[in-house]
């Protein structure tokens, strides 16, 4: 049975392809990563991360402003802070995904062997980042981070590098702990 081509982000149809990727990652990640080619260009995955980061940053700013408004404490400083946080989230998302890919590559090289490259792991992480489209929703955001950087990365690593279940769990946890710690640290700075 021939494998279908995985829907990847395309500059020709950015919104349609972004929805296809997010739908594939959120609702059928095993199928998405089963047919995923880790080797490929970085431009489209990076722009996908920027798009998801921009949407999430914007919606996060809207939620923060609505929350402040509902408590009657909306001032110019609150608006400036929400806009700046949303903008920084959007612009720094590709950097954060790159750092996460570095942690996962270190775990892969430690527990799997000398396989993979930073570019391959970045592509896996970039599309897993699509789950963070839900990050702006209070409470759901914590689950979205865990789903993206533990579950989806585990599925991606298992599918691309053909690792055993236990190796996948160890690699996913070894990569997730520093990624989550860094995210908590950065979030508490703001």
Regions flagged by a language model, labelled:
Residues 2-5, 9-12, 16-20, 62-63, ...:
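Selective transmembrane helix interface/packing segments
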Residues 1-3, 25-37, 67-80, 115-129:
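Hydrophobic alpha-helical transmembrane segments
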Residues 47-70, 80-104, 123-153, 170-190:
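Hydrophobic alpha-helical transmembrane segments in multi-pass membrane proteins
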Residues 23, 103-127, 158-163:
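Membrane-interface segments at transmembrane-helix boundaries
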Residues 1-55:
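N-terminal juxtamembrane cytosolic/stromal segments of multi-pass membrane proteins
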Residues 37-41, 45, 73-89, 112, ...:
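Membrane-helix interfacial "entry" motifs
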Residues 34-37, 66-73, 112, 155-165, ...:
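Juxtamembrane transmembrane-helix termini
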